[in-house]
UniProtKB/Swiss-Prot annotation:
GN (gene name): pdxY
Catalytic activity: pyridoxal + ATP = pyridoxal 5'-phosphate + ADP + H(+)
A Pfam family matched in the record: Phos_pyr_kin
Subunit structure: Homodimer.
Enzyme class: transferase
Gene source species: Salmonella paratyphi A (strain ATCC 9150 / SARB42)
Pathway info: Cofactor metabolism; pyridoxal 5'-phosphate salvage; pyridoxal 5'-phosphate from pyridoxal: step 1/1
Official protein name in the record: Pyridoxal kinase PdxY
Residues the record lists as binding substrate: S9, T44, Q45, D223
Record-level GO BP terms: pyridoxal 5'-phosphate salvage
Length: 286
């Protein structure tokens, strides 16, 4: 069973960051060690919340505690997501180095959350710059959405070919694998939700139906997507197998959420279909 140190946000009510990804990852058979960068009452797209950003030293101290009991060598991957500050990011890279010193086979999966002010997702100053300058070259796998891909590659991405090229430019700087979590306007069809999974040698495209939630889209979809992909890859799935399972599993969560007329992702209700999706979507090699 794989062990994943997941360093990202936590909400007490609802699902975002670790609160979205932790349970689905466990449902696929991974041990998740959740380490929270922030603890908020709820996710920020409600427009108001309470809570705090964890001091960067808190992250390092917790991981040192795990090292002190001799367990860090059993960590197979570090996953990072929403950061409360750029300084937290610097400490996370120190943690990645510490984990890799204990287990040289461990991977670093970076979900470079950079914020979408128009959607109510706010990140602290310097976080985007941290991802571009430091997290990108340190990562083994990175999972930007379209906007984040453009920021990381420093140019516009207007179609699928552009996205593959931009992903390969990122690979040249460090990562082995790039997941483009949402192609949006750069995809083949505005009627579908599309993703890319790219390495230096391969590029896989997949699409599924959009699920219409109106103006109030659920939060945490990207967090679940990143977490599930990491689990599948650690378990030995091929790029194609991992992409197909994750796409179907996330779709099952979206369908359950829509059916129950909820705003928060219904990961518990969809748990059996996360492990064994009823839908299937085929990935195409480009």
């Amino acid at each position: 069973m794989k062990n994943i140190l997941a360093i990202q946000s936590h909400v007490v009510f609802g699902h975002a960051g670790n609160s979205a990804a932790e349970f689905p990852m466990r449902r696929l058979g991974a041990n998740v060690w959740p380490l929270n960068t922030v603890q908020f009452s709820n996710h920020t797209q409600y427009g108001k919340w309470t809570g705090c950003v964890m001091p960067p030293s808190h992250l390092t101290e917790i991981v040192q505690g795990i090292a002190d009991i001799g367990q860090l060598a059993h960590c197979d991957a570090v996953l990072s997501g929403y950061l409360g500050s750029a300084e937290q990011g610097e400490h996370i890279l120190g943690i990645v180095r510490q984990v890799k010193a204990a287990n040289p086979q461990a991977k670093y999966f970076c979900d470079p959350v950079m914020g979408h002010p128009e959607k109510g997702c706010i990140v602290a100053p310097g976080v985007a710059e941290f991802h571009v300058r430091y997290a990108l070259p340190a990562s083994d796998i990175i999972a930007p959405n379209l906007i984040e891909l453009e920021i990381l590659s420093k140019h516009s991405v207007n179609n699928v070919n552009d996205a593959v090229q931009a992903a390969r430019e990122l690979i040249a700087q460090g990562p082995e694998i790039v997941l483009v979590k949402h192609l949006a306007r750069a995809g083949y069809s505005s009627e579908r939700f599309e993703m890319l999974l790219v390495t230096a040698q391969e590029a896989w495209h997949i699409s599924r139906p959009l699920v219409d939630f109106g103006s109030r889209q659920p939060v945490g979809v990207g967090d679940v997507t990143s977490g599930l992909l990491l689990v599948k890859l650690l378990q030995g799935a091929t790029l194609q197998q991992a992409l197909e399972h994750v796409t179907a599993a996330v779709y099952e969560i979206m369908i359950a959420t829509k059916t129950m007329q909820e705003y928060e992702l219904q990961v518990v209700a969809a748990q059996d279909r996360i492990a064994n999706p009823e839908h299937y979507f085929s990935a195409t090699r480009l």
